[in-house]
């Protein structure tokens, strides 16, 4: 039986309404976030002890942060530690709650009279609120946040940092929204916080994402809400009311682990005309691995052994696993068009173009007879990405990696631009 980890816990760094943060003496740059058995509403104007809430909240946060980390979102989460706590990189918190909304409800309707409940935002609407309990967390504009000239862990919060947090908020919401859909749950809105990692000086998703952080409606039906709004809506807090709230929280905790899996299988099969193309194919396989997609390599020639090519095709069609075929053949590419003409599965041609005859060879992948729907992508990484986009339509884990990759590319460009501008000053 595994021995429970013994932590050398230091001083309390912070205490909030529902959690405490402690330093870890043996792990500089790491902290312990300990959840409480407490539920609050209205900036703690209403608060109650709720036995078991700490474990529920910790489970939800740990699963959600794991999901986001595996997708590629930078997150202040190291690992779950016991039932009610987790270890995370130490951050200096930015005192802004970022809210992302798909459906208009709650406080948005009060602040925007005339908007009807249920109005849908395309894209999701991002708002920010300054954390100030005494003033009920007032809504802030982008300009107010920049004018505040906050500095955390040596990082000044300017236009670049605000843009990064805004884009990250939308991406995180969309990943979680997509992840809840297979459970027939609508993510209505969500609030998150960011911090600056004291070690890396990077902005990361921090704090927690638990059942206090969102509105979650099974079947898109508000009357079935399973989030903290069920506690806010209690006219009077009674033991029976708290038990109902706890059951709602347990309902979410029971399902959140399912977000880490997908019921939709996927597979890429790379067909190469010759082992001389193996290096090209290995790049495709590696890129597929980055999206969590299993990839198999096979050798077959549609010119020299069409019967074997079609036998291999039938082998993969016969096991019921959704498959994208990638054909890798230089010179005269018969492999991609022959496969495409004989299967209803998607086929991508990814010819290894060479400098000498490449300009001529590529036409065998581009000029095709009618009835052939074979796409052509020259980049090995690009062909894997296109396969991922096909699978991402029905696999939220693949889609999450694609969405996080898009965000991270945008952030890297934004940071590169900031660095260049600073060099020019």
UniProtKB/Swiss-Prot annotation:
One Gene Ontology cellular component: cytoplasm
Subunit description: Homooctamer.
Coiled coil: none
Chain residues that bind CO2: 332
Span list, region AIR carboxylase domain: 267-425
Protein name: Bifunctional phosphoribosylaminoimidazole carboxylase/phosphoribosylaminoimidazole succinocarboxamide synthetase
Region ranges (SAICAR synthetase domain): 2-260
PROSITE patterns the UniProt entry points to: SAICAR_SYNTHETASE_1, SAICAR_SYNTHETASE_2
Residues carrying Phosphothreonine: 238
Record function comment: Bifunctional phosphoribosylaminoimidazole carboxylase and phosphoribosylaminoimidazole succinocarboxamide synthetase catalyzing two reactions of the de novo purine biosynthetic pathway.
Biochemical pathway: Purine metabolism; IMP biosynthesis via de novo pathway; 5-amino-1-(5-phospho-D-ribosyl)imidazole-4-carboxamide from 5-amino-1-(5-phospho-D-ribosyl)imidazole-4-carboxylate: step 1/2; Purine metabolism; IMP biosynthesis via de novo pathway; 5-amino-1-(5-phospho-D-ribosyl)imidazole-4-carboxylate from 5-amino-1-(5-phospho-D-ribosyl)imidazole (carboxylase route): step 1/1
Lineage: Eukaryota, Metazoa, Chordata, Craniata, Vertebrata
Acetylation listed as a keyword: yes
Phosphoserine, modified sites: 27, 107, 274
EC number in record: 4.1.1.21, 6.3.2.6
Family: In the N-terminal section; belongs to the SAICAR synthetase family. In the C-terminal section; belongs to the AIR carboxylase family. Class II subfamily.
Start and end residues of each stretch annotated as Linker: 261-266
């Amino acid at each position: 039986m595994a021995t429970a980890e013994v932590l050398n816990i230091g001083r309390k760094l912070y205490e909030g309404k529902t959690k405490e943060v402690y330093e870890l003496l043996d792990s500089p740059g790491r902290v312990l976030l300990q959840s409480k058995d407490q539920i609050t509403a209205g900036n703690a104007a209403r608060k109650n002890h709720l036995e078991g809430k700490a474990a529920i909240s910790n489970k939800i946060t740990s699963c959600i942060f794991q999901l986001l980390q595996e997708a590629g979102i930078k997150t202040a989460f190291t690992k779950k530690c016991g039932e009610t706590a987790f270890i995370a990189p130490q951050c200096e918190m930015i005192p802004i709650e970022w809210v992302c909304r798909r459906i208009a409800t709650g406080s948005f309707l009060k602040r925007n009279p005339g908007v009807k409940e249920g109005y849908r935002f395309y894209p999701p609407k991002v708002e920010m609120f300054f954390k100030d309990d005494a003033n009920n967390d007032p809504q802030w504009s982008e300009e107010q946040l920049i004018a505040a000239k906050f500095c955390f862990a040596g990082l000044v919060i300017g236009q670049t940092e605000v843009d990064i947090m805004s884009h990250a908020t939308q991406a995180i919401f969309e990943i979680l929204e997509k992840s809840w859909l297979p459970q027939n749950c609508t993510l209505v809105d969500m609030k998150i916080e960011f911090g600056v990692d004291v070690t890396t000086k990077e902005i990361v998703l921090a704090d927690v994402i638990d059942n206090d952080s969102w509105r979650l409606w099974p079947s898109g039906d508000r009357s079935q809400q399973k989030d903290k709004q069920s506690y806010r809506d209690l006219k009077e807090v009674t033991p029976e009311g708290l038990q109902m709230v706890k059951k709602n929280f347990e309902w979410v905790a029971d399902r959140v682990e399912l977000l880490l899996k997908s019921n939709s299988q996927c597979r890429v099969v790379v067909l190469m005309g010759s082992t001389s193309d193996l290096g090209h194919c290995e790049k495709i396989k590696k890129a597929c691995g980055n999206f969590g997609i299993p990839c198999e390599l096979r050798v077959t020639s549609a010119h020299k052994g069409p019967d074997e090519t079609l036998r291999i095709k039938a082998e993969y069609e016969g096991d019921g696993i959704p498959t994208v075929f990638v054909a890798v053949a230089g010179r005269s590419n018969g492999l991609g068009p022959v496969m495409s003409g004989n299967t209803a599965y998607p086929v991508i041609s990814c010819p290894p173009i060479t400098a000498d005859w490449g300009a001529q060879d590529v036409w065998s992948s581009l000029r095709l007879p009618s009835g052939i729907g074979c796409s052509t992508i020259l980049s090995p990484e690009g062909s894997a990405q296109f396969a991922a986009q096909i699978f991402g339509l029905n696999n939220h884990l693949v889609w999450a990696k694609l969405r996080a990759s898009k965000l991270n590319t945008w952030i890297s460009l934004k940071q590169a631009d900031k660095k260049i501008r600073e060099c020019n000053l």
